[in-house]
């Protein structure tokens, strides 16, 4: 489980970091300025998407261990968390708050779910965090052009260059990962 988790972390981390760092810019450059808010939504949803991607393939462990009741409890917790988030966002009349609460609540549930899977599989938590940390470092290096861009004034040309460099670095990282997987 820890090995699969690490591979999934290496796959999911770069796009998550790109969205978390530059979601509004990606959406506004790609679709126009009126889509900027969708990029803000994507920023809030990035951690949740990451955790779903690295956790969902491991969820078959519930069936293997015949712990379907635990999966039902997880789904109930997830449903309750999401309902509370949406109701609170509606009560406050703030769409962004609703999306943020929904996403952060879902991410928290999936994090607990991931910790349960790691524990149930007999793996040490440190093994999975080590893999996540490695993925974070490599992804941080891959998206470093976007990080550098935040230190300079906004300019659409610079954003384009940063996105291009980031795309090349992420693609290079994926090629290295695929080469290792096929050896």
What are the roles of these predicted feature ranges?
Residues 120-136, 144-183:
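Membrane-proximal transmembrane or re-entrant/amphipathic helices at the cytosolic face
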Residues 1-76:
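Specific pore-lining/lateral-gate transmembrane helices of multi-pass inner-membrane transport
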Residues 7, 41-44, 58-66, 98, 115-130, 132, ...:
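Alpha-helical transmembrane segments
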Residues 4-7, 13, 17, 49-57, ...:
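Hydrophobic alpha-helical transmembrane bundles that constitute the permease/transmembrane domains
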Residues 39, 69, 76-111, 118-123, ...:
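Membrane-interface helix-loop junctions in multi-pass transport and translocation proteins
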Residues 16-24, 29, 41-44, 83, ...:
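Membrane-embedded alpha-helical segments of multi-pass transporters/permeases
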Residues 24, 33-36, 96, 126-130, ...:
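Generic alpha-helical secondary structure signal
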